[in-house]
Amino acid sequence: MCSIETPHFVIQNGRVQPRFPGGISNELADHIAAELVPLGLVRDISAFERIFVDTVLAARPDPMQAWTAFYGNTMRRLRRPERGGTGAVATFARIYAHALSLVRGATVLDVGCCFGFLPLLAAEQDPRLRVIGTDLVPATAALASRISRVHGGRARFAAADLLALPVADEAVDTVLAVHVLEHLPAGASTRALAQLRRVARYRVVIAVPLEESPDPVFGHLQAFDLPRLAGVGGFPPTPGWSRAVCAADGGWLVLDRGAPDALPDRVGTRCPN
């Protein structure tokens, strides 16, 4: 009987058994990548998602209790991230904080929101905001909706395709797409950006990881550096829009619809406020 032990998993006869006595949060993604990928147990996003979900569900006998605990652990760490931390939760806490600092207006749409941590944080931190999160996977959007109701129901969630958003033109003040574009084929970036600009009244905020090559384990289909991200934003910028590109825990593309206080068109290392 072959058995391999890592800090958070026991692999026996090809079966992965998790061990997280301190509780499971979204740091699980780091542990899968660091401990199981080198063993050849996770070769693509399908295997990653299967192990991720199975690990979360193994923590409690009731599935909803398991997901509620997962959300609770993650949200607590996002609210009080480890200073200077490099793990998934600490890194995304900084990314989410920066994204929220760029919000203009009173309505926010977060596309490709996955578990919906960013919309939940936005609704929690600013009661004045009307926040909607969308994800391509209906089950993920439904799970986020159930968790939102536990948190007062201020953030709303729906299933939607980024390439065909069921949202009227200029219907929301700020549109966020945080770590979404890298999951699209390169040829779809222009279509995605057209949808984001269409529904945004004031601003579009896009964040991507900066990579030399796409990481298939996380489902990445294209890789970005700052020049390529700037190219997605258009050069020269789309008429009526200004553009800023910068780096801060990844790459950022901020597009403002033409206005007296719109961002100047620029590409650099310092991110706008």
Predicted region positions:
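Hydrophobic adenine-recognition pocket in adenosine-nucleotide-binding enzymes
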Residues: 180
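A conserved beta-strand element that flanks and buttresses the S-adenosyl-L-methionine
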Residues: 176
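Conserved N-terminal segment of class I S-adenosyl-L-methionine
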Residues: 1-164, 190-193, 222, 226-231
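Intrinsically disordered, low-complexity peptide-like regions
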Residues: 108, 171, 271-273
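Conserved acidic residues
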Residues: 106, 173, 202
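S-adenosyl-L-methionine-dependent methyltransferase catalytic module, highlighting the catalytic core
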Residues: 1-29, 163, 184-273
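Short amphipathic alpha-helix with an adjacent loop that forms part of the alpha/beta core around
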Residues: 165-170
